[in-house]
Amino acid sequence: MDVLIIDDEKNIRQLLKEIMELNQFNVDIAKNGAEGIELFHKNTYKLIFIDKRMPGISGEEVFAEIRKSDKNIPVYIISAFQSSTELEVLKKGNITGVLMKPFTIEEVMKIVRKHLG
């Protein structure tokens, strides 16, 4: 599998999935943090997108769980709200980057090209 997308918003999941599939990448989708963690532990991914604010297990908690197992996989947090303090905390936790909502297809493709070629 190439990409894991974890987001509680159906529209965001669908948009990212379509972008990946149009570019011939295999995608798994999780609609919450628990599903995302389960998929992460069952499969190997080359790139992960995680929504920061989700009910139940937050994106930050999912990120922390991923980093326990894999320190190197590129992980991008999807967020509509990002203070400079929050960004610094995420970077200290070894986050690869932040994809700010609303995002463009080109912003997503720049990330994909960087990590998946």
Predicted stretch roles:
Residues I29-L47:
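Acidic, metal-coordinating helix/loop segments flanking the phosphotransfer/catalytic sites
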Residues D51:
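Active-site residues of response regulator receiver
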Residues N32-E35, S58-V62:
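Acidic catalytic/metal-coordinating carboxylates
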Residues M54:
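Receiver (REC) domain active-site loop signature in two-component systems and cognate sites
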Residues E61, Q82-G97, E106, K110:
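Alpha4 helix (beta4-alpha4-beta5 surface) of REC/receiver domains from two-component response regulators
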Residues K10-D28:
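Two-component/phosphorelay signaling modules centered on CheY-like receiver
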Residues K101:
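A Lys-centered signature of the CheY-like receiver
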